[in-house]
Amino acid sequence: MKILGCFKIVPDLDFIAQEDWMADGQLQVDTSYAKLLWNCFDEGALEMMLRLSDLSEGFDVVYELNALTVGRLRHETFLKTLYALGFSHAVRVEAEEDVDLRFCPGLIADVTAKYVKETASSDVIVMGTQSSDGSNMKTPLLLAERLGWTCITQVTAMEPVDEKHLKVTSQEDGKTAVQVVTVPIVLAVGNAPCAYLRVPTLKDKMKLGKRPIEHISLHEELAESQSRNVELKGLTPI
């Protein structure tokens, strides 16, 4: 079973000085100097994938873990960490420094869906339910819509069943739901108990962390997305 983990790298906003919380001409705050972190929900999702793989031995199921992120060159260190943890393939969709993708869930969903349909098919896509900066909570749902797959949100655990099924635990209206689901499926991870990603050993970093990372251009999808956008021409008082 092929599982694709989609994640986002975000700045540590605790490092932003109070006097730096000033928007520029494009209504953006400069966070370029802040420390980079895994998005907290995505970090839990990636660890959940590893734990699922750990449990697979007793179920005679083989899980191929892959990872995809939309980000800059400096984000590749995180992909190398996933290689060291045992992920099979890592992909970075190249985002330009001057392109703000925080509030573009449709574009992110389009890029991911195109990759799954045309380049590398997957049985399960796992990602955090939201990010700490954009926080739109739309990307998993839009991705499932693009693919025509089922989507379960607020996932807290995954367990192996067989090559075509997973046992998924999620939160629904304050209650816990446990269900056996059929792949393909999109799983959006919420407040999972496994909130932190394990740390690879130095040996694994040296042995596995230097594998090549696949790169995908964002230009075509970005142009299509911008052509569909509505342009604000002006505001008139009522």
PLM regions: where:
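Short Gly/Thr/Asp-enriched flexible loops that form oxyanion-binding sites at enzyme active sites
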Residues: 134-149
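Electrostatically charged, flexible surface regions
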Residues: 155-238
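A glycine-rich helix N-cap at a beta->alpha junction
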Residues: 77-111
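Gly/Ser/Thr-rich loops at beta-strand to alpha-helix junctions
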Residues: 71-74, 130-135
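N-terminal beta-strand-loop-alpha-helix module at the start
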Residues: 1-66
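Short internal beta-strands
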Residues: 64-72, 92
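Glycine-rich phosphate-binding loop signature in dinucleotide/nucleotide-binding domains
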Residues: 112-122
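Glycine/charged-rich beta-loop-alpha catalytic/anionic-binding loops adjacent to active sites
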Residues: 24-35, 88-96, 121-127
